[in-house]
């Protein structure tokens, strides 16, 4: 008699509030660290971002299971680190149905991830949905500087 035993390990998805440090630990560190280190934002744009970051807070809805989140969220934090972002950033994990235990994804009309929502003085000013229109730092600059920005899914 032959008995085969197989063991499969699946990455645990994080649903609800996420501490950035949790993405820097396994099983998420593999993709987070690689994408963070490989992303090279444009220096000129970083300098411009520093001048428009006042009174900005950001909420990021992401799926640790989502390839777009795995690519853009680390790049986003690289940009924030390069510009020495001073505001608050809140990370929220969603399940594959784009839901959260508290209903915050539904309340914020999250249809695709990642979604980066930018607030100034407590009011939403705009959002990046799933992927940037140009480069991530260019989209952030357009939003924070008040340019006419439409995310990927806006008509």
Features from the language model and the residues they span:
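Bacterial Sec-dependent N-terminal signal peptides
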Residues: 1-14
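Local sequence-structure signature of Cys/Sec-based thiol-disulfide redox active-site neighborhoods
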Residues: 49-83
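Loop/turn elements at helix/coil->beta-strand transitions in domains of secreted/extracellular proteins
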Residues: 54-57, 87-88, 121
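Thiol-based oxidoreductase modules, predominantly thioredoxin-like and allied folds used
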Residues: 60-64, 87-100
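Thioredoxin-like thiol-disulfide oxidoreductase module
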Residues: 92-112, 141-144
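Non-catalytic, surface beta->alpha helical segment in thiol-disulfide oxidoreductase systems
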Residues: 112, 117-154
């Amino acid at each position: 008699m032959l008995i085969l035993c197989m063991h499969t390990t699946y990455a645990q998805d994080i649903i609800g509030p996420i501490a950035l440090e949790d993405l820097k630990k396994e099983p998420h560190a593999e993709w987070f660290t690689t994408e963070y280190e490989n992303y090279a934002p444009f220096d000129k744009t970083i300098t411009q971002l520093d001048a428009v970051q006042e009174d900005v807070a950001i909420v990021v809805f992401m799926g640790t299971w989502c390839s777009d989140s795995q690519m853009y969220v680390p790049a986003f934090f690289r940009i924030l680190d390069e510009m020495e972002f001073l505001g608050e950033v809140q990370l929220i994990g969603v399940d594959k149905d784009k839901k959260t235990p508290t209903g915050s994804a539904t309340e914020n009309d999250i249809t695709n991830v990642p979604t980066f929502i930018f607030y100034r003085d407590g009011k939403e000013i705009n959002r990046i949905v799933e992927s940037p229109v140009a480069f991530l730092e260019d989209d952030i600059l357009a939003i924070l500087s008040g340019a006419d920005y439409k995310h990927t899914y806006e008509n």
